[in-house]
Swiss-Prot record:
Note, other: Carminate, also known as cochineal dye, is used as a fabric and cosmetics dye and as a natural food coloring.
Its job: Membrane-bound UDP-glucosyltransferase (UGT) which catalyzes the C-glucosylation of kermesate and flavokermesate to produce carminate and flavokermesate 7-C-beta-D-glucoside (dcll) respectively. Carminate is used as a deterrent against insect predators.
Pfam families: UDPGT
Gene: UTG2
CDD domains to which the protein is assigned, alphabetical: GT1_Gtf-like
GO cellular component, one term: endoplasmic reticulum membrane
Principal localisation: endoplasmic reticulum
Official protein name in the record: UDP-glucosyltransferase 2
Localization: Endoplasmic reticulum membrane
Amino acid sequence: MEFRLLILALFSVLMSTSNGAEILALFPIHGISNYNVAEALLKTLANRGHNVTVVTSFPQKKPVPNLYEIDVSGAKGLATNSIHFERLQTIIQDVKSNFKNMVRLSRTYCEIMFSDPRVLNIRDKKFDLVINAVFGSDCDAGFAWKSQAPLISILNARHTPWALHRMGNPSNPAYMPVIHSRFPVKMNFFQRMINTGWHLYFLYMYFYYGNGEDANKMARKFFGNDMPDINEMVFNTSLLFVNTHFSVDMPYPLVPNCIEIGGIHVKEPQPLPLEIQKFMDEAEHGVIFFTLGSMVRTSTFPNQTIQAFKEAFAELPQRVLWKFENENEDMPSNVLIRKWFPQNDIFGHKNIKAFISHGGNSGALEAVHFGVPIIGIPLFYDQYRNILSFVKEGVAVLLDVNDLTKDNILSSVRTVVNDKSYSERMKALSQLFRDRPMSPLDTAVYWTEYVIRHRGAHHLKTAGAFLHWYQYLLLDVITFLLVTFCAFCFIVKYICKALIHHYWSSSKSEKLKKN
């Protein structure tokens, strides 16, 4: 009996593998928090018997069956933890330059892939599905066209106009602040006017600059001159996965092919390294975790800022875990520094009290999942909007990166740690965030395999995705109505003038006859 069950189990495994799809995932992106979102899905798909080929900068430490990696981490132009404070100031002050940098970085990713002989070897391979990231350009969309395979895109941020627009999903600037803005949901007239300007600017920049002539020229050099325009391929995207959830973001109208998977990267906490475990276990007053993400080098901040953090932390009864690049830096006795910390596992520890963060989307969602209140120091991109939304919910306070004094840091940390309402509201938000019919990972897996089964999901797409921009905005209808109204007014005016003229002419004739 046991032998028959073993044979049946082996047969099931073989059948699931033989029916597995060939999937290509394109994630050369150099921010590990961005890749973590895709990684959770890709590893699960591989475990379910699909053959997953992934271009990545973060290869697995241990081989995963059915997951075949093309490691581009050593490529020129890719660098993790590379943003220094001086460059950070430029990014903060110039949103337009920030967006152009996103576009240039996306093209760099494509150049790295297109110049890699291992990627060239799979260019003509037949894939059943292609998965890519929404960032600054879709110069890699040609892989889906080459295989005649459906395309799924993943956005590791809250909803952006350029991501929603490709799916035919409404993105209304009247109540949807653009991702870089600091506007509230309820905007006044001037904020709505500025928001509309930014909204149109980003749409133009993404589709006509990010996916414009230069991107097409580069892609056609790799895929062939018969490749369609990038935007044409992008508007055929089958699904968009968005790493957010309506409980932490304002509710949006979403079409069926835009699916929220907020928190897909959050895992069950694993045992911590012994030193960190001991440090946290023995923290009588709890632990504060401080990191500004994988992109920014905290050690390059001005000396007075670093000193302000040291002095503030020294006065706290809590212990502090600080992600800091220079591990030889002299620190207070209650501070443990490392170049890297297992963030997800730290959040799962019972003694964690607060999270000092830049407000990056992935880390913020981990904090929400585990119910850890936030002291936010937003730097760029979506981080201000993320932190401001948490401040509005009463689960975070905001610190200005250009005003990081000892007193400000101490005041913010003490407020969040000592005022229990922050922790209580974050735990309530965590319950809302977790309360779903399916886990975000199960949701993503289901819809990915749905697209594979049906060879695309174009039946989920609204007709809005195929309208010209002036049709989508009803500018042609509005123009017609205005012209018709003006013509009607002109005709009425002409008739009235004619009638008046006729009346006065008749009156004059009558008077002349009487005289």
